């Protein structure tokens, strides 16, 4: 047997692929190096003119800045489940036959929990990772239908909430043959029953990474069970798939949770709202609003002048 490290690909110029560290601010330039970071393996597949999409997609057509953030998240060190640590996500695979580019793109993206999105200018990528709220929406922002409903809620089907996952991955401890990692949620099995899903972890050669992939599927399906549907005006054009938003629905909360600001007095630091509000007698009250940079911020309320 012999071990093939794989291709030398283009990686950020400020990136050390051996130590998986980044120095300074990236200027956008690239350098050749060996790397199994899935973000830059994807970049190589999309931009290489011989075996990739390089003859149809130029470097300017792929959002390398989004891949840079994704690559940093993949390189973060996490417990491997056996007392040590390892990168969160690595990619070790080879393509032995010609396939449709969309299928290959989906396999590459599945290795780092992201999806491709064409934003009108470039092919960018949205990853499921912790992020800040992009924008809050209240009842005053949405279009009300003929029934007087602005936010419409629905839930996932019980059959779509898997409680056990069998993850197939390439196991170095098994002669680089396929092994299966079983991931279960005992509490969910007691509540919903055993609902098994079988999946392949493309490019995965780590048992710990395979376990995390199965655990992510279980937690996502058990915790993200509710969806909300609503209609916006032109302000909704600011979003791309994957943006995290905040819903302040008065009907859902059973109290007034949002509205509009009519005027701002900067000298007295006073906000005039479109309705009367009552602050709780105890605790700290805050107001969520959009600052001058177009980002949501949370500000403490220090006083409530009489209307």
Predicted regions and their residues:
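Short, hydrophobic/proline-enriched secondary-structure or compact coil segments at domain edges
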Residues: 1-7
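C-terminal extracytoplasmic interaction modules
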Residues: 16, 21, 25, 31-307
């Amino acid at each position: 047997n012999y071990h093939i490290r794989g291709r030398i690909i283009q990686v950020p110029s400020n990136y050390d692929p051996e130590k998986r560290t980044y120095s300074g601010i990236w200027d956008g330039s690239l350098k050749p190096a060996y790397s199994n970071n899935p973000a830059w393996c994807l970049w190589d597949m999309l931009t290489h003119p011989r075996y990739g999409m390089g003859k149809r997609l130029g470097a300017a057509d792929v959002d390398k800045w989004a891949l840079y953030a994704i690559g940093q998240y993949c390189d973060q060190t996490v417990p491997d489940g056996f007392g040590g640590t390892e990168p969160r996500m690595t990619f070790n695979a080879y393509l032995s036959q010609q396939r449709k580019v969309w299928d290959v793109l989906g396999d590459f993206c599945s290795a780092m929990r992201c999806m491709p999105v064409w934003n009108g200018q470039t092919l960018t990528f949205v990853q499921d990772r912790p992020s800040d709220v992009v924008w809050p929406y209240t009842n005053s922002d949405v279009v009300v239908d003929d029934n007087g409903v602005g936010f419409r809620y629905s839930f996932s089907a019980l059959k779509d909430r898997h409680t056990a996952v069998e993850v197939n991955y390439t196991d170095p401890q098994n002669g680089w043959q396929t092994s299966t990692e079983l991931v279960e949620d005992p509490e969910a099995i007691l509540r919903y029953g055993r609902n098994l899903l079988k999946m392949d972890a493309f490019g995965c050669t780590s048992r710990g990474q395979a376990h995390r992939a199965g655990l992510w599927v279980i937690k996502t399906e058990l915790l993200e069970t509710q969806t909300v549907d609503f209609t916006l005006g032109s302000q909704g054009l600011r979003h791309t798939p994957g943006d995290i938003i905040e819903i302040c629905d008065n009907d859902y909360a059973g109290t007034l949770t949002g509205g509009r600001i009519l005027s701002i007095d900067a000298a007295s630091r006073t906000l005039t709202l479109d309705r009367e509000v009552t602050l709780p007698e105890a605790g700290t009250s805050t107001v969520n609003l959009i600052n001058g940079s177009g980002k949501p911020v949370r500000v403490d309320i220090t006083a409530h002048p009489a209307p």
